[in-house]
UniProtKB/Swiss-Prot annotation:
Required co-factors: [4Fe-4S] cluster
Keyword Iron: yes
GO terms of biological process kind: dimethylallyl diphosphate biosynthetic process; isopentenyl diphosphate biosynthetic process, methylerythritol 4-phosphate pathway; terpenoid biosynthetic process
Active-site residue numbers: E132
CDD domains registered for this protein in UniProt: lytB_ispH (cd13944)
Naturally occurring in which organism (per UniProt): Paracoccus denitrificans (strain Pd 1222)
Reaction(s) catalysed (UniProt annotation): isopentenyl diphosphate + 2 oxidized [2Fe-2S]-[ferredoxin] + H2O = (2E)-4-hydroxy-3-methylbut-2-enyl diphosphate + 2 reduced [2Fe-2S]-[ferredoxin] + 2 H(+); dimethylallyl diphosphate + 2 oxidized [2Fe-2S]-[ferredoxin] + H2O = (2E)-4-hydroxy-3-methylbut-2-enyl diphosphate + 2 reduced [2Fe-2S]-[ferredoxin] + 2 H(+)
EC code: 1.17.7.4
Keyword Transmembrane: no
Protein name, as recorded: 4-hydroxy-3-methylbut-2-enyl diphosphate reductase
Length: 316
């Protein structure tokens, strides 16, 4: 039998589920226990196929619009948040609904409303079309939120009154890219108001920091996550920017391109905030099967954040 080549696997920590994702999944599971199947979920509860498929197997039905939900069945709004019009329509139809919006996203919604109440126009740093961005922009009347994705976009926006602006950000952005966009906004609009610190959440920040911590030791980085997961895609970009010659997103172990990492002697592994640890275990097992493996954990922070589920699910 051929001798396995040696390889060190660096597991970044923190990785995987954040408190908002954990809460959202619990909400669907508790709703199924409380009301029985089917329970409808507007949009994927979190952006991970493995999670969505497992909840679907338990009786969750995933739809994109409220129109697809029968009025007599409960509906859950995804962790990414929804425009104000969605719960308003659910109330009009007298539907039972549970909002699984991450509390850190809801905090951004509150910021936007507070600035709007003071007569400020909002600038949102985020990715066009992402559900979180659609939900946050949908908290205010049309035209009240200007979206910028890049430093170049800052030069293109035309606010109503350049002296009456505030900015907010999507919670799952690249920390470094966002800092550059904020600097561009402050240079063009010196009076622009913003949060005490950017709205990028603790989990996004921590996962990016852990990738940077291992980047100098590895030949390749694998990020476990879904293609539609914003925070997972940012981790791939952070890895590349930190000097990883090969930085790749994989949903599961069967997507690993073994030829692409054939020459590697050290590989980093992390997981996006909506990827369960079972998928990390699967990847580690796949490396064990091919290599004489040494596994090292590199921990840059400890997370103990926990969010309560809504009261309606805690009541008997």
């Amino acid at each position: 039998m051929d001798k396995k080549p040696p390889l060190t696997l660096y597991l970044a920590a923190p990785r995987g589920f954040c408190a908002g994702v954990d809460r959202a999944i619990k909400i669907v599971e508790m709703a199924l226990q409380k009301w029985g199947a089917p329970v409808y979920v507007r949009h994927e509860i979190v952006h991970n196929k493995f999670v969505v498929d497992s909840l679907r197997d338990k009786g969750a039905v995933f739809v994109e619009e409220l129109d697809d939900v029968p009025s007599d069945r409960p509906v859950i709004f995804s962790a990414h948040g929804v425009p104000k019009a969605v719960p308003a329509e659910a109330r009009r139809r007298e539907m039972v609904f549970v909002d699984a919006t991450c509390p850190l996203v809801s905090k951004v919604h509150v910021e936007a409303e507070r600035h709007h109440a003071e007569g400020l126009q909002m600038v949102m740093i985020g990715h066009a079309g992402h559900p979180e961005v659609l939900g946050t922009m949908g908290q205010l009347p049309e035209g009240e939120v200007l979206l910028v994705e890049t430093v170049e976009d800052v030069a293109r926006i035309e606010p109503r009154d350049p002296g009456r602006l505030a900015f907010i950000t999507q919670t799952t952005l690249s920390v470094d890219d966002t800092a550059a966009i904020v600097a561009a906004l402050q240079a063009r609009f010196p009076g622009i108001r913003g949060p005490a610190k950017e709205d990028i959440c603790y989990a996004t920040t921590n996962r990016q920091a852990s990738v940077k911590a291992i980047a100098g030791r590895i030949d390749a980085l694998l990020v476990i996550g879904a293609p539609n997961s914003s925070n997972s895609r940012r981790l791939v970009e952070v890895g590349s920017a930190a000097g990883c010659a090969y930085s790749q997103l994989v949903m599961r172990a069967d997507q690993i391109d073994w030829r692409a990492i054939a020459g590697a002697r050290a590989v980093g592994v992390t997981a996006g905030a909506s990827a369960p640890e079972v998928l990390v275990d699967e990847v580690v097992a796949a490396f064990h099967a091919r290599y004489d493996l040494t596994v090292e954990m590199v921990e840059t922070a400890r997370e103990n954040v926990e969010f309560k589920v809504p009261r309606v699910l805690r009541e008997a």
